[in-house]
A protein has these predicted regions:
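Nucleotidyltransferase catalytic core that binds NTPs
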Residues: 1-194
Length: 194
């Protein structure tokens, strides 16, 4: 089975993440997509990052009972910081029956040379890149095994959502799955006092 690994902080997971996952499985680029909740992205600051289990719960609420979208806490048991090269190697060892494909945004592709062991990732895995606002990718320059998917360009980010929640009492959960928004409200996540 071909499994797309979509790693991220998902702080919080939003409709753009879900739309991308649904698009990838609908267009048969992957059989399943696993949202790999990362304890800490080594290239991002930890400030404002919700607890691992809170982000995992929000992701599970968003995905619900989907048969082809899954949420994984696989990285929670790995040494920190979480490097995708290590995660993918551990996944290959734990699940040799699957073909793991890394799913990243165009913004991450621009930073990919700074990743831990990027050549190892490219040697063992195909990559699917999805468009992000402000990051152009020349499809003709991509290495073998790297595909630019023609996914819809969604201008939504977790950072925008966190800022909106913290600054606007009238924010109504735009861009969030209703179950996620309800949990964020109930727990008081992303408020100025959080």
């Amino acid at each position: 089975m071909t499994i797309g690994i979509y790693g991220g902080s998902f702080n919080p997971i939003h409709q753009g993440h879900l739309a991308l996952g649904r698009w990838l499985v609908r267009h048969t680029l992957v059989d399943e997509l696993w949202f790999m909740v990362s304890p800490q992205n080594p290239l991002k600051p930890a400030a404002g990052l919700l607890d691992d289990n809170a982000r995992l719960r929000l992701a599970r609420l968003a995905v619900g009972r989907s048969q082809r979208l899954r949420v994984s806490d696989f990285e929670f048991s790995l040494p920190r910081p979480s490097f995708m090269a290590d995660t993918l190697a551990a996944l290959r060892q734990a699940h040799p029956e699957h073909d793991f494909v890394l799913v990243i945004g165009a913004d991450n592709w621009h930073d990919f040379p700074r990743w831990h062991r990027p050549d190892d990732i490219l040697a063992h895995h195909r990559l699917i890149i999805y468009p992000r606002p402000g990051y152009d990718i020349d499809n003709t320059t991509l290495p073998h095994g790297v595909t630019l998917a023609a996914t819809p360009l969604l201008d939504i980010s977790s950072t925008q959502i966190r800022r909106a929640i913290a600054s606007d009492r009238a924010y109504a959960g735009q861009g969030l799955h209703p179950r996620v928004w309800k949990e964020i409200q109930a727990c008081g996540y992303y408020t100025l006092t959080d």
